[in-house]
A protein has these predicted regions:
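Conserved alpha/beta-domain cores
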Residues: 99-100, 553, 563-909
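Short mixed-charge
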Residues: 77-89, 519-522, 729, 761-770
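Structural motif
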Residues: 463-465, 484, 506, 575, ...
Length: 909
């Protein structure tokens, strides 16, 4: 605990920190400091650094409080000086907010406390000073509610129960016959505070703390503690945020949006976070505090006239009713709106990115509480980057780096078919949050979404009155989210947008009964397990399952892909087994096929019969008869691939799986095979038993099969070469690469290459023509990697099969790792699932060694990977640094890999 600065003050257009100090002050603290420095109106406060978070977990609560006390007391005096109020004073009490602020934005994952410093004396002083006792008691009840939840652990007893404080509020409203919190009187609020405190005493056995300093230390430590809560841990895991970063804590003088009809609070975006449209938008609530907007307990109104009119059209509200009941901030407080509009524009121009801002209007005065780069959908991400490039706000390289590769996946998600929508039954309408389409069975609790996915593989629709941060895991596992309350800036909408999940919020017609597990809406009853569909673009909710179609990609997407190609070094190919897959990959910009799995061609129609005939053959002659039937089929398949790729390289892998995968293992299937093949059942059973292996992954497969039965390699080589020559004859150039799988010894490869070359020469002689082709190998056996110098004497290219290379290097079975992987991740034994993200220290080192040794033998050796890692951004980055020529992935991952390759090249420079 060396003598270092742990607290940084800000206020009155001065700050000890700045926007570049995110690592130390967190995103919120750094931006609060920066907004002060550029003249934005921000309530004064101070930020406790992220380093203290680490000390909190190392030394404990009491040690951290004693360590912080002098600096915090000094910083509090600075706030007192700037506000003219005093913390803990009985006449002019200073009230503060306590908020988390990690280096990376984690919306709703950690805790916030408002109105801290309130007690029985302070509430009377605030009432007297403002002449507004209702406001004072409303602020007091909010503080007790938030502090009770965050610091004292006042949570629902079971998942069917509601928040204990909300239950008390609902009882009070029912007792008074009112609908909204804002309809409660001062006396009602006094009774709420009394009942809140009684509930705290009953559940915790302790009195609610009244000393402001005790409250402050409790809140600071609770915010640090929230860094390791379950939802924050999960969010960090999903977004690759290291636990060691920690969170900062910002303490700020309160400004109040709940002082009456001339006060408000809101959240806004400088551009549309769902679509990317250059339209200032957001939501606000009159006579409310910030948590009311994001918590979704009240459905807010729109900030701009344009946004309000669009909302009214979507909700089928007339213009007359909109103006009377749901006016925009632009109409209600035009001068404040004008200032807010100028500030948002200033912030976007200054930070050169779309801004998410929180603000409060206290008695007609605008205050900014936060700004950050806004979370956005994949579609919005691309549009904003391309628009800002066209506007001259950012350059090409920044535009490319501004787009996260993984989020491109959202653009490729299916959308509802318009014809299907026309015939669908709309039940309610809500507010469209992230666009897209989602369909699935209804569940009402987060853990049930997890269970449905685990049991059925089907993603459900999570239906909630409003979501809370505790629902994060269920939201992740759901296909979409539907809420009865909340707006487009509520927790559900913001988190869903960040995840790329479809969400419809604020569907107020829904009557949700958690205990009965039903929804009542417009005469319909929807039970748990019934299917519904969500339209995230319109806010409509449909009964049943609605058909979907492939998404239409925008011109901005094409422009981004062009830029990615301009700045990347690493090429991107696709794993494709059919002409349809190849055409899709080509449309996404793939520069070849990096893996064509020939065995996938054997499972259709008469093909499986021919391969089974080969398996049942008693000798080579019999096998050749069966293979002759497969030859024209394979040749036709290859012709389709070569035509689809139109001159780009195509890597064809020879037969890889063991033969037992082509025969049935159940009695019914074996009987059907016997009848179809016209042989006794006993022969089928005997053959299946003879093919069985204890460890088929390491068994009779790949080049071992080709060397045992060279006639298989001959047939495939002939089909490939003949197909290439046929396509070449049509005027389409062909670049074919023949890949031998599972090589661990250069002699295995040499035997296979000799068969391929001999077969090719026979075809050339028959056709009186030639084509160029290459023979290479998959590096998936660790021995192949460490003897790559020998293998490169034969191989003209290497393709790393990282799926099997990971299995053999780590000794993990991909099919069985699920039994212990969660424990290994939790204990930190593994940082990531090695089958999702390449293990750089183990598998990665083998790849580097193989590339180095291989090119030592053959200088121009082409190297790529074709495992699932080829479409994972951080693995693509590794491949760039390792000097590979290309990565290959599934067609729908091609855009992601292309953008990741550009990121790797730009970040290296």
């Amino acid at each position: 605990m060396a003598d270092v600065k742990r607290v940084y003050t800000f206020g009155n257009k001065e700050a000890e920190g700045n926007g570049k100090m995110r690592e130390l002050l967190g995103g919120k603290g750094a931006n609060l400091a920066e907004m002060n420095l550029i003249g934005i109106p921000v309530p004064p406060g101070f930020t406790i650094t992220t380093e203290v978070c680490a000390e909190f977990y190392k030394h404990g609560k009491e040690a951290v409080i004693e360590m912080l006390r002098p600096e915090v007391e000094k910083a509090m005096k600075n706030i007192e000086k700037l506000t003219g109020m005093k913390f803990g004073d009985k006449e002019m009490p200073l009230l503060v907010s306590v908020r988390s602020g990690a280096r990376a934005s984690m919306p709703g994952m950690m805790d916030t406390i408002l109105n801290l410093g309130m007690n029985d004396q302070a509430v009377e002083a605030v009432a007297k000073r403002t002449g507004n006792p209702r406001f004072a008691w409303d602020s007091y009840r909010r503080f007790v509610q938030m502090y009770g939840d965050v610091v004292l652990g006042m949570k629902p007893v079971s998942k069917e129960d509601h928040d204990p404080f909300e239950v008390i509020i609902e009882e009070q409203k029912a007792k008074k016959g009112v609908k909204n919190d804002t309809d409660l009187t001062t006396d009602d609020l006094k009774e709420l505070v009394k009942n809140f405190k009684a509930a705290v005493k009953k559940q915790t056995g302790e009195d609610f703390p009244t000393c402001p300093w005790d409250q402050l230390w409790g809140a600071i430590c609770a915010v640090f503690g929230s860094w390791m809560n379950e939802r924050a841990i999960l969010y960090r895991k999903l977004n690759n945020i290291p636990a060691e970063w920690g969170t900062a804590v910002s303490v700020q003088a309160m400004v109040f949006g709940n002082m009456g009809e001339n006060s408000a609070t809101g959240v806004a975006f400088s551009r549309d976070a769902a679509t990317g449209e250059n339209l200032f938008n957001g939501e606000y609530l009159i006579n409310a505090q910030g948590e009311d907007v994001v918590a979704g307990i009240r459905t807010p109104q729109q900030i701009t006239i344009e946004g309000s009119k669009r909302w009214a059209v979507a909700q089928k509200v007339s213009e007359e009713e909109r103006k009377a009941k749901f006016p925009s901030l632009e109409e209600v407080m035009p001068e404040v709106y004008k200032e807010l509009d100028e500030i948002q524009h200033h912030l976007e121009q200054y930070f050169k990115d779309m801004q998410d801002i929180e603000f409060t209007i206290q008695d007609g005065k605008l205050w900014m509480l936060q700004c950050r780069n806004g979370k956005r959908t994949g579609a919005a991400m691309v549009k904003i980057a391309m628009d800002m490039l066209r506007e001259g706000l950012i350059d090409e390289k920044t535009a490319v780096l501004r787009c996260e590769p993984a989020k491109l996946d959202e653009l490729l998600h299916p959308v509802f078919d318009k014809k299907a929508i026309a015939n669908a039954q709309v039940i309610p309408r809500g507010l469209p949050a992230p666009p897209g389409a989602a369909t699935g069975p209804v569940v009402f609790f987060a853990e049930d979404a997890e269970k449905v996915l685990e049991k059925t593989g089907q993603r459900a629709i999570l239906v909630r009155i409003e979501t809370s941060p505790e629902d994060l895991k269920g939201m992740l596992d759901a296909a979409g989210i539907l809420t009865a309350r909340g707006g487009m800036t509520s927790h559900a909408a913001v988190v869903a947008r960040g995840m790329g999940k479809c969400c419809v919020s604020g569907a107020g017609e829904l009557q949700i009964d958690y205990k009965a597990r039903t929804i009542q809406v417009n005469g319909f009853t929807v039970k748990e397990g019934d299917w519904i569909s969500l339209n995230g673009s319109t806010g409509e909710v449909y009964l049943g399952q609605v058909a979907t179609k492939a998404a239409d990609l925008s011109g901005d997407f094409g422009q981004l892909m062009d830029l990615a190609g301009k700045y990347s070094v690493l090429k991107v190919r696709a794993n494709a087994d059919t002409p349809k897959d190849a055409a899709q990959a080509f449309a996404f910009g793939a520069e070849g096929i990096g893996l064509c799995r020939t065995e996938h061609m054997f499972f259709e129609g008469d093909r499986i019969k021919a391969i089974r005939e080969m398996i049942l053959a008693d000798d080579e002659a019999g096998r050749r008869v069966a293979l002759a039937k497969l030859l024209p089929i394979q040749r036709g398949d290859f012709e389709g691939l070569f035509k689809a790729m139109n001159g780009y390289p195509v890597t064809v892998r020879l037969l890889d799986p063991p033969l037992h995968e082509f025969v049935p293992h159940d009695e019914k299937g074996q009987k059907e095979m016997a009848a179809e093949m016209g042989v006794p059942l006993q022969k089928i059973v005997a053959k299946v038993e003879s093919l069985a292996e204890f460890n088929p992954m390491l068994g009779h497969r790949g080049c071992r099969l080709g060397n045992t039965y060279p006639e298989i390699t001959e047939m495939q080589a002939r089909a490939i070469i003949e197909a290439a020559m046929n396509v070449k004859a049509t005027g389409i150039p062909v670049h074919v690469e023949i890949m031998v799988p599972l090589v661990g010894n250069h002699k295995e490869l040499r035997y296979q290459k000799n068969i391929i070359d001999t077969t090719a020469e026979q075809v050339f002689s028959e056709r009186n023509d030639k084509i160029d082709y290459m023979v290479g190998t998959m590096i998936e056996v660790p021995r192949a990697a460490v003897t790559a110098n020998q293998i490169a004497e034969v191989a003209e290219f290497f393709s790393f099969g990282t799926n099997d290379l990971t299995q053999m290097t780590l000794g993990f079975s991909r099919d069985d790792i699920g039994k212990f992987l969660p424990v290994y991740l939790e204990k930190g034994i593994l940082k990531n699932d090695p089958f999702q993200i390449l293990d750089r220290n183990g598998v990665g080192q083998l790849i580097r060694e193989a590339v180095f040794k291989g090119r030592g033998t053959r200088e121009n050796l082409k190297c790529g990977i074709c495992g699932e890692h080829g479409g994972e951004p951080s693995s693509v980055e590794f491949c760039h640094y390792a000097g590979l020529n290309y990565v290959s992935c599934s067609p729908f991952r091609v855009p992601i890999a292309r953008l990741a390759a550009a990121h790797a090249a730009l970040n290296q420079k």
